[in-house]
Amino acid sequence: MQSSDKTDEKRWLGRFSNIDAITGLCVLAVFLFGIAAAFSSKDTRNLTVVADVPIYYPVAPPEAAPAPSDAADKLAPEAAPQPAPAPDQPQAKQLANSSPAFISLLGDDRLEASYYLSQSKAPRDFYGGRWAPENIESTANGTTFSVKKEGNTDVPFSIAEASTYKRYGYGRYEAIMQIGKGSGLVSAFFTYTGPYFGDPHDEVDIEFLGKDTTKIHFNYWRNGKRGKFATFDLPFDASEGPHLYAFEWLPDRITWYVDGVPYYASELNDPFIPKTAGKVHFSHWTGIPKMREWHGKPDFGTEAVTTVSCSSFTPMGEDKRSCSDVYKEKKNS
């Protein structure tokens, strides 16, 4: 009886040994299959090395975090770390017609040397006033862009806009601006090209509404189609002093900055990222009555001013003097 028990015991132990061996082989096979599948996947974004300081989107300043506005345009992309380019990825090419780096200290530099001043005799499109070159002036603090009441029923307002003669592509765009305050006003810093120039409508924007200058708006367009725009609260009132605003437009992503802090970015490889070099624009305007639901009824007195004291462009992959340097120098002084 005892001998039989020992035989059964050996038999059961042998079975468990076989089961353990089979289980181990199964686990090893699954592990090897997972590795093979990962490396054979066409989408290798999850395998790339994350940058030393990963950026998550939307991005908020560490101290006073801007929350997305309660407005209808709360379309921030889901949070995702920004991957670094793969080592074997070819360097992205600059867009055709893109010009070299520049920096303009507006107020000191003669604006007309680099910028075209928009001009019209009457309101057109969705703009509620005539473009008036005389509403752009150089001052000790920078170049002012004024919106004025005209007292004319047909032309109730005069508005201001300047755009570069040259076109610019991938790189970092910066401006130091103090925004005009008052319901009905729109201040904008953006790149644009479109059918007027024989191009698709491509655009990257930073916009402010004078009715609430504690908010900032980010937009982008490709071939007339709008990407995922967003509105953020600022930790300051943009009408009370100059601040540094910027966006970095790259082939696979656009990132927007306020005072050097990243606030928002498009999704990686978003199909709405522009692909055509455009002109740099600054504008200050009020719209036709249909636009008042967005920017408010004009109620800013007889004149309101947006001031731009610096504008710069640094091409992708280059390191040039920019408005960031000017802003730091002014703060330090």
Mark where each language-model region is.
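N-terminal Lys/Arg-rich, disordered targeting/topogenic segments
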Residues: 1-14
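GH16 jelly-roll
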Residues: 11, 15, 19-26, 33-62, ...
